[in-house]
């Protein structure tokens, strides 16, 4: 059978192992072809091809449920659930999403883009199944990196106390999340990864005991436990952990041996209780470059399949904000041993890999544990350290209570750098960094800021570290503007001080962060129509520069705010609240992201759809304030 002929995963039923192996080769070929052309997650999917095929041969996906953690490893799933012909549109506007999405396919049973959610969701489905009296199977597939997340461990703890609830958790253990996994649990998994597979003692042990002369069917209580006792002696140490938590442990299993995987999954389904199947895979399997560099090939832009090298863009791009942040923090750490960089399993993505390489003693990776990262930093700040927590905007949402309870209320000097703030592009709604302005504005004691360019990022970083309370600095995804940066001598900003970039009397445009450059472009378009704009770089959303903004607004009487974040509770709302609190009755036109989910597309495509391109903003400003005359 050809992969292109698969329209339903149940077509895998009855295929031989050799036929499945042939389909596995076709999946890898298609996977590599598309990702090398348009970019996407590479290594995770290549590592679970055999696992996916074997698992789906043991399930009826018209009824059974599978929850894939994060979705990085979901490309093989998509290819065998009817999306082969559309796969060229992966992560493109109106195309196949990069993550599982319930609205895209009936086989995407649960959507996700953040880690560690799968076991909770699958357990919820299992409980719903049992209450309805149904009998479909529920499976969660989770990576060893995601297993470091507290939510996954909470779900395991809960499921283990439901011994009569059938649930299969497949641990995809490739010794790698996005960055190498950290922590005691990861070390524990490493100890057993190369252990011989554990073949569990079946109920025949108890049957054998029954056949002992003089005992027969009346088994003493002490002997009833013999099976469990012998099993615990045989279980590898990591298996013992899951056994103690109420799971039956199976493994470790070779994740590329389809026949053995099928047998193991069938055995797991028969147990009718919580089972953890430990599957050992190779991230990037089948593509030597991805196997050799599992971090670099976790996700890739377009690349040459023959050489494995990224295809350079036609136009050289300036260095990214993330790298500028990482390089600047390294310089600061070299000068101050009390400064410590903290990440939650995203060293490369946040730019902290340079700190990890050069000063590992001032670098901490907590794993996929954002809540812990925040409170860890809070504790460190109590005893004189200066923690800088670098987390994607979308992932910091997971630690909102810790921001309030552990940092804000106690007014602790913790610096947060929110990477990927604003519109991020092809990763879609699970990864858009559109909410941080809104959710952080409400927390007392926090200072919130965003730079207009790379140089201002450096100044804001030293400002944050020097501040005696909590700060949050948001930076956008991707390249900077090409503004020159300094190796040292960064001048701190005055907290809450904005700046006027251009003078004008017709319209006041107050822009925040990445939208300052767009505001300047918009002003040029307006100037061509004899409309002169006063452009203010707000720098801070909390506190606002009241002394600068209010007199300008009172004089010009027409105000526009620009932000790359959700409008509800955002920067524009802060300006409106400022005017309202000071009884200034001035029309304010807020430009930002409305109350919508921003789907996967390129950043510019998303901005165009939202009306955030300079030409669109200029036209809308003219219409809003009737400036045609």
Curated annotation (Swiss-Prot):
Residues involved in thiamine diphosphate binding: 72, 113-115, 145-146, 174, 287, 370
Keywords attached to this entry: Isoprene biosynthesis, Magnesium, Metal-binding, Thiamine biosynthesis, Thiamine pyrophosphate, Transferase
Gene Ontology cellular-component terms listed: cytosol
One Pfam assignment: DXP_synthase_N
UniProt xrefs under CDD domains: TPP_DXS (cd02007), TPP_PYR_DXS_TK_like (cd07033)
Positions that bind Mg(2+): 144, 174
UniProt KW Transport keyword: no
Disulfide bond annotation, renumbered to this chain: none
Entries under SUPFAM superfamilies matching the protein: Thiamin diphosphate-binding fold (THDP-binding) (SSF52518), TK C-terminal domain-like (SSF52922)
GO molecular function annotations of the record: 1-deoxy-D-xylulose-5-phosphate synthase activity; magnesium ion binding; thiamine pyrophosphate binding
Coiled coil stretches, renumbered: none
Function as written in the Swiss-Prot or TrEMBL entry: Catalyzes the acyloin condensation reaction between C atoms 2 and 3 of pyruvate and glyceraldehyde 3-phosphate to yield 1-deoxy-D-xylulose-5-phosphate (DXP).
Subunit architecture: Homodimer.
Pathway this chain belongs to: Metabolic intermediate biosynthesis; 1-deoxy-D-xylulose 5-phosphate biosynthesis; 1-deoxy-D-xylulose 5-phosphate from D-glyceraldehyde 3-phosphate and pyruvate: step 1/1
Catalytic activity: D-glyceraldehyde 3-phosphate + pyruvate + H(+) = 1-deoxy-D-xylulose 5-phosphate + CO2
Record-given protein name: 1-deoxy-D-xylulose-5-phosphate synthase
GO biological process: one example: isopentenyl diphosphate biosynthetic process, methylerythritol 4-phosphate pathway
Recorded family membership: Belongs to the transketolase family. DXPS subfamily.
Cofactor: Mg(2+); thiamine diphosphate
UniProt entry tagged with the keyword Zinc: no
Record organism: Prochlorococcus marinus (strain MIT 9215)
Cofactor binding comment, as recorded: Binds 1 Mg(2+) ion per subunit. Binds 1 thiamine pyrophosphate per subunit.
E.C. number: 2.2.1.7
């Amino acid at each position: 059978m050809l992969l292109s002929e698969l329209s339903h995963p149940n077509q895998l039923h009855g295929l031989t192992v050799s036929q499945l192996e042939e389909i596995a080769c076709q999946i890898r070929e298609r996977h590599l072809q598309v990702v090398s052309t348009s970019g996407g997650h590479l290594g995770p999917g290549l590592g679970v091809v055999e696992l996916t095929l074997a698992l789906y041969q043991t399930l009826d996906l018209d009824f059974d449920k599978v929850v894939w953690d994060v979705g990085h490893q979901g490309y093989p799933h998509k290819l065998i659930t009817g999306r082969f012909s559309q796969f060229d549109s992966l992560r493109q506007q109106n195309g196949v999403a990069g993550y599982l999405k319930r609205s895209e396919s009936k086989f995407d049973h649960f959507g996700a883009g953040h880690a560690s959610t799968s076991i909770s969701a699958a357990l919820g489905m299992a409980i719903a199944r049992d209450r309805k009296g149904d009998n479909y199977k529920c499976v969660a597939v989770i990576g060893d990196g995601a297993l470091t997340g507290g939510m996954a461990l909470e779900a395991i703890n809960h499921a283990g106390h439901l011994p009569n609830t059938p649930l299969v958790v497949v641990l995809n253990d490739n010794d790698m999340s996005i960055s190498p996994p950290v922590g005691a649990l990861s070390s524990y998994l490493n100890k057993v990864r190369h252990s011989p597979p554990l073949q569990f003692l079946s109920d025949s042990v108890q049957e054998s005991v029954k056949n002992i002369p003089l005992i027969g069917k009346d088994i003493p209580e002490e002997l009833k436990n013999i099976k469990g006792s012998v099993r615990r002696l045989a279980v590898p140490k990591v298996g013992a952990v899951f056994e103690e938590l109420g799971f039956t442990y199976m493994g470790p299993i070779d994740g590329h041996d389809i026949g053995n995987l099928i047998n193991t999954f069938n055995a797991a389904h028969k147990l009718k209780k919580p089972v953890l199947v430990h599957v050992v895979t190779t991230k990037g399997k089948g593509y030597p470059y991805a196997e050799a560099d599992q971090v670099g090939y976790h996700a890739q832009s377009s690349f040459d399949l023959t050489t494995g090298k990224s295809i350079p863009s036609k136009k050289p791009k300036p260095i990214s904000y993330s790298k500028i942040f990482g390089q600047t923090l390294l310089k600061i750490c070299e000068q101050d041993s009390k400064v410590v960089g903290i990440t939650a399993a995203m060293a490369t993505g946040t730019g902290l890999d340079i700190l990890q390489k050069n000063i590992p003693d001032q670098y901490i990776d907590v794993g996929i544990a954002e809540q812990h990262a925040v409170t860890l930093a809070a504790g460190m700040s109590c005893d004189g350290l200066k923690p800088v927590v670098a987390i994607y905007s979308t992932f910091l949402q997971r630690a909102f209570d810790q921001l309030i309870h552990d940092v804000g209320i106690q007014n602790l000097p913790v610096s947060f750098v929110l990477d990927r703030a604003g519109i991020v592009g092809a990763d879609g709604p699970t990864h858009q960094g559109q909410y941080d302005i809104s959710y952080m504005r409400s927390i007392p004691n926090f200072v919130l800021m965003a730079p207009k360019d790379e140089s201002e990022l450096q100044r804001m970083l030293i400002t944050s570290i020097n501040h005696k309370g909590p700060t949050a600095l948001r930076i956008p995804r991707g390249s900077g503007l090409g503004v020159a940066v300094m190796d040292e001598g960064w001048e701190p900003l005055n907290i809450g001080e904005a700046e006027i970039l251009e003078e004008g009397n017709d319209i006041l445009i107050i822009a925040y962060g990445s939208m300052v450059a767009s505001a300047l472009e918009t002003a040029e378009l307006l100037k061509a129509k004899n409309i002169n704009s006063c452009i203010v770089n707000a720098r801070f959303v909390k506190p606002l520069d009241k002394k600068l903004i209010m007199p300008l607004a009172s004089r010009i009487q027409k105000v526009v705010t620009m932000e790359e974040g959700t409008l509800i509770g955002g920067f524009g709302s802060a300006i409106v609240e400022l005017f309202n609190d000071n009884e200034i009755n001035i029309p304010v036109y807020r430009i930002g992201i409305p109350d919508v989910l921003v789907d996967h597309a390129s950043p510019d495509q998303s901005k165009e759809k939202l009306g955030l391109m300079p030409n669109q903003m200029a036209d809308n400003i003219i219409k809003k304030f009737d400036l045609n005359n």
